[in-house]
UniProtKB/Swiss-Prot annotation:
Magnesium recorded as keyword: no
GO annotation, cellular component aspect: cytoplasm
Record-linked CDD domains: GroEL
Functional summary from the UniProt entry: Together with its co-chaperonin GroES, plays an essential role in assisting protein folding. The GroEL-GroES system forms a nano-cage that allows encapsulation of the non-native substrate proteins and provides a physical environment optimized to promote and accelerate protein folding.
Organism field: Staphylococcus epidermidis
Main location: cytoplasm
UniProt-annotated binding residues for ATP: 29-32, 86-90, 413, 476-478, 492
Single GO BP term: protein refolding
GO molecular function term, any single one: isomerase activity
Gene for this chain: groEL
EC assignment: 5.6.1.7
Catalytic activity from the UniProt record: ATP + H2O + a folded polypeptide = ADP + phosphate + an unfolded polypeptide
Protein name (database record): Chaperonin GroEL
Length: 539
C-alpha cells in the first residue's frame, strides 16, 4: 500500500486537530456538572456514558493524520485506566493542554527536546509534591467518600465500602448485571488466581473479552495436555451433560488447544483452558486447594491417574467461573465444607511453623482464597441503557477506591494539582527547559478550569482564586461553594492523579518531538461493473 508523508509543522497541526476532536468530546464529562456523551452502537441501543476511556475508544477519525493524533490521546486514557482504573478524563484534559501549549512554543521556534526536558523535570517535582500532601485512607467512611465522588453517587460509595469491609482491601469484588431495578451487594464464597484463558477465542463476551461459565465442570490436573485424544472421552461426557468446562492444567497446547478452540467456535461445547497457578511445590498445593474448594480430584501421576480414564465424578463444580486475560475467579465452589475447613486449618498450622515472611504471606493468601469470598455488586436499573452507564460508573469507582487505599488521597476536583503549582514553579531552569516547566504549570490548572466551565462558570476566575486559597480548600462545583475538600469528602486517589499526570506528559512529550508522520493512502474503490459471460465490462 502506498504511503503519504507530512513533515514538521504540517504533521503536528494535522495531528493536533485529531487531539482536539477527541479531547473536546471527552472533557465535557469532567466534574459534578459534566455532561454525558451518546455513543452509537451497531445492532444495539446507543450507550450513554461519562466514562472518558469508553468515549475515547469509540473515536475513529476519517483523516489518517487526525486519527493518529486522536490515537495518541486515546493511549493516555488507556494507560491511565490500566494503571489506576480511573482519571481518564483528567489525563485527557492534561494531555490536550500540554500538547496545545507545547505546539505554540514549537511553532515560535522552541526546541522540542528542551521542552521535553522541562516537562519531565516539572512532572517529577509535581509527583513528589503530590505524595507530600497525600493522606492515608483510614476508615470505612473515607473509602465510601472516594467511591461516591468517582461515581457521583453516595449509594455506590457505600456499596463499595461495605464490599471492601467484608472481603478485605485486597479481596475480590466483581460487578454483575441484576434483573431487577435495585443495586444490591452479595458476598459469595470464591477463589481467584492470576492465570487467564489460553486463547482469546475462548471468550463468551467479546465486548469485555471475558469468559463467563455458569455451573461448569472443573478439571484439575498437573499434566500437560497436548493430545486432544487424551481428553476426548471426558469432553464427550461433558457435552452429554450440556454443561461448560474449565480446564486447569500445567499447559494446554498443540492439537488439544486447537481442537478446543475450533469446537468452541463451532458451538459444539464451551470450554476454557487456563494454566495452573503458581510454580513448583506451590503450584501443586494451589491445585489441591482448588480441587478441595470445587470437590474435584487432582488428575496426577502421583495418584496413578490418567486423563483418558477421567470421568465426571473426578471433576469439580462451581456455580460460576469468570475468566479474563489475566485472572480466573471461581465463585461458589461445591466442595465439601468439612474438607475446606480441614484444609484451612492445615495451612494455618503451616503459617505457625514457618519463619519465612515470604512463605507466610503466600500461605495467608491461600487461606484468604479458601476461607474468604468474592463480593458481588449486582447493578440494577430501569433500562438497559441506564444499566450499562451505571455499571461503568461503579467499575470506575471501585478502581478509584482501590487506588486510594494503595497510595492515599488528595483534595479532589483538580484542587491538588493547583495546590502543587507553587512547588513546581520554584524549579530553576532556563530557555526551552523553563518553557517546558511552564507548559506543565499551565496544564496543572486545566482540570479545575474545565470543571468550572462545565458548571457554567468562568474557569480562569476560579483558578486564580484557588491559587491564593489555603491548602486543601477548593471549589465545590456541585454547590458553587468554596470548602475544605478533604473535610467535605471531595477527594481523588493520589494514584489516579499521579498516573493521569505522568501519562499525559509522556504522550505530550512524544507528540512535540514528532517531525514526520507516515500514513497509508487508501486504495481507490473499483466501481467498474463486471461484464457478462466473461466479456469485458460494458461502457
Amino acid at each position: 500500500m502506498a504511503k503519504d508523508l507530512k513533515f514538521s509543522e504540517d504533521a503536528r497541526q494535522a495531528m493536533l486537530r485529531g487531539v482536539d476532536k477527541l479531547a473536546n468530546a471527552v472533557k465535557v464529562t469532567i466534574g459534578p456538572k459534566g455532561r454525558n456523551v451518546v455513543l452509537d452502537k451497531d445492532y444495539t441501543t446507543p450507550l450513554i456514558t461519562n466514562d472518558g476511556v469508553t468515549i475515547a475508544k469509540e473515536i475513529e477519525l476519517e483523516d489518517p493524520y487526525e486519527n493518529m493524533g486522536a490515537k495518541l490521546v486515546q493511549e493516555v486514557a488507556n494507560k491511565t485506566n490500566e494503571i489506576a482504573g480511573d482519571g481518564t478524563t483528567t489525563a485527557t484534559v492534561l494531555a490536550q493542554s500540554m500538547i496545545q501549549e507545547g505546539l505554540k512554543n514549537v511553532t515560535s521556534g522552541a526546541n522540542p527536546v528542551g521542552l521535553r526536558q522541562g516537562i519531565d523535570k516539572a512532572v517529577q517535582v509535581a509527583i513528589e509534591a503530590l505524595h507530600e500532601i497525600s493522606q492515608k485512607v483510614e476508615n470505612k467512611n473515607e473509602i465510601a467518600q472516594v467511591g461516591a465522588i468517582s461515581a457521583a453517587d453516595e449509594e455506590i460509595g457505600r456499596y463499595i465500602s461495605e464490599a471492601m469491609d467484608k472481603v478485605g482491601n485486597d479481596g475480590v469484588i466483581t460487578i454483575e448485571e441484576s434483573n431487577g431495578f435495585n443495586t444490591e451487594l452479595e458476598v459469595a464464597e470464591g477463589m481467584q488466581f492470576d492465570r487467564g484463558y489460553q486463547s482469546p477465542y475462548m471468550v463468551t463476551d467479546s465486548d469485555k473479552m471475558i469468559a463467563e461459565l455458569e455451573r461448569p465442570y472443573i478439571l484439575v490436573t498437573d499434566k500437560k495436555i497436548s493430545s486432544f485424544q487424551d481428553i476426548l472421552p471426558l469432553l464427550e461426557q461433558v457435552v452429554q451433560a450440556s454443561r461448560p468446562i474449565l480446564i486447569v492444567a500445567d499447559e494446554v497446547e498443540g492439537d488439544a488447544l486447537t481442537n478446543i478452540v475450533l469446537n468452541r467456535m463451532r458451538g459444539t461445547f464451551t470450554a476454557v483452558a487456563v494454566k495452573a497457578p503458581g510454580f513448583g511445590d506451590r503450584r501443586k498445593a494451589m491445585l489441591e486447594d482448588l480441587a478441595i474448594l470445587t470437590g474435584a480430584q487432582v488428575i496426577t501421576d502421583d495418584l496413578g491417574l490418567e486423563l483418558k480414564d477421567a470421568s465426571l465424578d473426578m471433576l469439580g463444580t462451581a456455580n460460576k467461573v469468570e475468566v479474563t486475560k489475566d485472572h480466573t475467579t471461581v465463585v461458589d465452589g461445591n466442595g465439601d465444607e468439612n474438607n475446606i475447613d480441614a484444609r484451612v486449618g492445615q495451612i494455618k498450622a503451616q503459617i505457625e511453623e514457618t519463619d519465612s515472611e515470604c512463605d507466610k504471606e503466600k500461605l495467608q493468601e491461600r487461606v484468604a482464597k479458601l476461607a474468604g469470598g468474592v463480593a458481588v455488586i449486582k447493578v440494577g436499573a430501569a433500562s438497559d441503557t441506564e444499566l450499562k452507564e451505571r455499571k461503568l460508573r461503579i467499575e470506575d469507582a471501585l478502581n478509584s477506591t482501590r487506588a486510594a487505599v494503595e497510595e492515599g488521597i488528595v483534595a479532589g476536583g483538580g484542587t491538588a494539582l493547583v495546590n502543587i503549582y507553587q512547588k513546581v514553579s520554584e524549579i530553576k531552569a532556563e530557555g526551552d527547559v523553563e518553557t517546558g516547566v511552564n507548559i506543565v504549570l499551565k496544564a496543572l490548572q486545566a482540570p479545575v478550569r474545565q470543571i468550572a466551565e462545565n458548571a457554567g462558570l468562568e474557569g480562569s476566575i476560579i483558578v486564580e482564586r484557588l491559587k491564593h486559597a489555603e491548602a486543601g480548600v477548593g471549589f465545590n462545583a456541585a454547590t458553587n461553594e468554596w470548602v475544605n475538600m478533604l473535610e467535605e469528602g471531595i477527594v481523588d486517589p493520589t494514584k489516579v492523579t499521579r498516573s493521569a499526570l505522568q501519562h499525559a506528559a509522556s504522550v505530550a512529550a512524544m507528540f512535540l518531538t514528532t517531525e514526520a508522520v507516515v500514513a497509508s493512502i487508501p486504495e481507490p474503490e473499483n466501481n467498474e461493473q463486471p461484464g457478462m459471460g466473461g466479456m469485458p465490462g460494458m461502457m
